[in-house]
Amino acid sequence: MRKLKSFTFIALTAFAITACSGSKDVEQRPEQELYNVGQTHLQNGDYSQAIRYLDAVRSRFPGSSYSEQTLLNLIYANYKTQDYTQTLVLADRFFQQYPTSRNLDYVLYMAGLTNAALGDNYIQDLFRIDRATRESSSIKAAFANFQTLVQNFPNSPYAQDALARMAYIKASLARHELAIAKFYAKRDAHVAVANRVVGMLQQYPDTQATYEALPLMQEAYEKMNLNDLAAKTAAIIEANKGRTFAEIEKPAEPEGLLKQ
């Protein structure tokens, strides 16, 4: 047992020495070398090592000629390692440090993808009634990121994909609202049904889910003896009869995200 402890101690000591020497190695390398090694790891898909070296560039050489590109690469590398919180922290730092950069559209796009990834669990749980009142700040933040990108950089290479993702988010949130309206309808919560569908008409007027929610609103008004409102809703349904909506699929994970 004593020998085993001895060998364990030696192994742990060796590991500690190796770890320290590795850390020292990064600390002592010149900027150009750190940056180049980080870029090599990035190109090879070794994102954790890329972050290690690029973080050293950023912390040891602030304000250098590599600073902006290093921050862009760190945003990408942290996104790829699914450290979404850090990705958003770095994106916010980029907006503050480089408010006039020609890469703002890229950072907005990456922020949108990151917030969308954080909101994925929300979208997957859209029809869980026990979560009916839950708000998702992440998925709405993603929509805002993409919307800002499209409005401010309409000619950006990321604009078309951002539009597609906005459409998907909008359709998903509308389906969620429809599920909630159906939930209330089954419980004869007529006021809640009407209010929910009115909100859908305001926020998601051009979606399949909103059109499908209109009969629920008409029925709710009828049961509350609000006949004028029920008739107006029926007229809207009739005016949109036969209208078709394109099926919106979730956009695939984009390729070529590394900003050179």
UniProtKB/Swiss-Prot annotation:
GO terms for cellular component: Bam protein complex. A lipid is attached at C20 (N-palmitoyl cysteine). It comes from the Bacteria. It is a lipid-anchor. One of its GO terms (biological process) is protein insertion into membrane. Residues 1-19 form the signal peptide. Keywords: Cell outer membrane, Lipoprotein, Membrane, Palmitate, Signal. Pfam families: YfiO (PF13525). Part of the outer membrane protein assembly complex, which is involved in assembly and insertion of beta-barrel proteins into the outer membrane. Part of the Bam complex. Belongs to the BamD family. This is Outer membrane protein assembly factor BamD. It comes from Pasteurella multocida (strain Pm70).
